[in-house]
Amino acid sequence: MEGRGLSELFRNTSEDMFLKAMMENSMGVAAAAPSMEMMGFRNLSQGFREDSEELFNSWLMNGEIPGFSAMNNRPRQPSRLSSEAAGFPNQQHEIAQEHFPTDNLIPQNLAVHSEFTMNHNQQQLKNAAEKGMQASDLLLAKAWFHSTQPMTRSRSSELRKRYAAMQSNMPPITTETIETANKLRQDLTNASTVNSAPMSNTPSQTPTFVSPSSSSTSPLDNPHIVAQDTITSVVSMLKDTLERKKLSSHANGDTSSGISFGFYDSQHFQQNILGGTDIFPLVTTSQIQDSVMLPKVERPTEQGSGNFVAPANQVWLGTASREPSQSGSSTAIPAPSAGFEVCDDLPPIGQAMTVCESTRTNAANGNGTADCRSKGKDFRERILKENLKDDRKKGSLTRMGSISSEQADKGDPTKKRRVERSRKMAEAKERSSTPVIPSDIQVVLKRCETLEKEVRSLKLNLSFMNRKDSEQTKQIEELQKQNEDLVEEKERLLEEIERIVSDTNT
């Protein structure tokens, strides 16, 4: 609690000093803003680390819960980072090195009317003064977050789940907000000075929590822009056109028509930064001046967003697409850099290639464009040669069967039938042919065959004899019976003779 009271004391002191410096300026713009060292915050940074955990927890709750926003709870929160580029022009170098996150950026400036009164300017200056302490506290909270909770695989998956849950609760960007942004950009462009950056360069963003990419960057760096249905349809149509043009350019083998990337024409290129595969079609400024639904939004595309120091090499794109970028964007004023490095991921070969690596001197002299163009031309010629070699290899590896079958296919049908018939006869002969048997085994086999025949004949004779025997047995039995009958008749005749003889004697 002692640290909190000390924080409030220095916040009030910084408000007085900042407002005094602002009122002395005739333009009403923060042209001579006091630095962090003048207000004494540099030496007291160690004392504020005690409250960094509490500050980070409050910021985390404001970012995670959709209904519990900073605008409803803290009156100082809406101008936390929204006017940072216009409020601190003299701290440009310091802010660019510390690389403030833009997750809690609230598009309050989009609803501001074009006519700025003196009271409104004073209120904005007061909010900017109050923001100085909040930005330093947020920086300490981020440092504590990186030191105590390193990014691991499990935590990355958890943060992606939270991001997916929050993405469905984000409010869409309406037409009135875009029209108000156009009016605000025109008014601030006329009123801005050389040192101050216009607010139109600050993209209108809604608060998010975690990066949509799978890389282990900080979840405090990546903004997300909610697209409207009309914008989504236009972007999808531009993507289809881009795919058709890319296929036609690969098929016809055209040369690049005057862009620094050397692969495609002047309307599109495929961007692959930090492993992202989103396609951002380039639309010129003249094409979107008359469009209300597609205002021009300038934002830096960074190569790395994992540390506090802003990278020196940045590519500024004037695009009409409102799709979420895979890389983090910084609201700090970028360091002037003419060098850029963009990697294109070509789908036909599935490998990434560095298209251009130019220094500030080469880009200023115009040598970078020629180098990129020559590299792109050589790379496409190499791709075409590899594709031609692959086609030749595929043609040489094509087989039509065996040589004999290929020759038979080329002949007349009569010859084809003759060859087929001879092949079938040869196969039948091989199946019917018996293996060669030695002579002694052949003699034994023949002897066995003759013996089998004799045994068969003997069996027939035996059966015949048995049949004969049965007949003879029957005849014998009949004869025996007849014999018995004859014996009985003989005895009877003998008795008859004896009786007759006896009668004659008497």
From Swiss-Prot:
Coiled-coil annotated spans: 441-506
Induction (record text): Induced in roots 7 weeks after inoculation with the arbuscular mycorrhiza (AM) fungus Glomus intraradices.
Location(s) in or outside the cell: Nucleus
Keywords: Coiled coil, Nucleus
A single GO cellular-component term on record: nucleus
Protein task: Involved in arbuscular mycorrhizal (AM) symbiosis. Required for fungal infection in roots and arbuscule development during AM symbiosis.
Protein name listed in UniProt: Protein CYCLOPS
Gene source species: Oryza sativa subsp. japonica
Species lineage: Eukaryota, Viridiplantae, Streptophyta, Embryophyta, Tracheophyta
Encoding gene (name): CYCLOPS
